[in-house]
């Protein structure tokens, strides 16, 4: 549970799962996506390991992504089996509902960069209130009213929107 004004520290760490010894890192990247209507990046809050580059990127669709990457230009660097890549902070500006900080585009390259190791990440849901507003976008069709639901609950299927010359193919569930 969080409140407007709280600061959330987001950390990216790599942990080798196949062995306990260090390894040679050639390249890695991760995008940690967040909703700028719910979070605000705290300026100058990024702290990273040596050689890690960071960028805050605006994405299509309105989300933002805090991008962290490393590229070795000299045949790789020795890294410990567990390495803290970096942290950054987000200020909660949302006043209701919840939002997910999503781990996307995580890649750890093999030597030569033509493939990558399997990776997993953990998304984090930050909850201000458990009441969420679900909005429907009909792309120029008839209006579909917003619904308020408790976090984790399902919405009630609304009436199908109409748009001249188009037929609704179906709803996602």
Q: Which residue stretches match the model-derived regions?
A:
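Secondary-structure capping and domain/repeat boundary segments
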Residues: 129-173
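Acidic, low-complexity intrinsically disordered segments
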Residues: 1-131
């Amino acid at each position: 549970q969080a409140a407007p004004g709280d600061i959330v520290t987001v950390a990216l760490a790599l942990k080798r799962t196949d062995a306990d010894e260090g390894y040679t890192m050639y390249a890695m990247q991760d995008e940690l996506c967040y909703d700028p209507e719910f979070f605000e990046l705290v300026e100058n809050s990024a702290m990273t390991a040596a050689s890690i580059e960071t960028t805050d990127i605006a994405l299509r669709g309105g989300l933002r992504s805090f991008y962290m990457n490393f590229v070795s230009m000299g045949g790789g660097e020795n890294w410990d089996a567990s390495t803290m890549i970096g942290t950054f902070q987000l200020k909660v500006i949302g006043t209701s509902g919840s939002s997910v900080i999503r781990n996307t585009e995580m890649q750890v390259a093999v030597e030569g960069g033509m493939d990558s190791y399997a990776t997993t990440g953990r998304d984090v849901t930050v909850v201000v209130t458990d009441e969420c507003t679900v909005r429907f976008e009909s792309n120029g069709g008839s209006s579909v009213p917003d619904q308020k639901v408790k976090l984790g609950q399902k919405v009630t299927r609304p009436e199908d929107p109409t748009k001249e010359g188009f037929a609704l193919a179906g709803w996602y569930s």
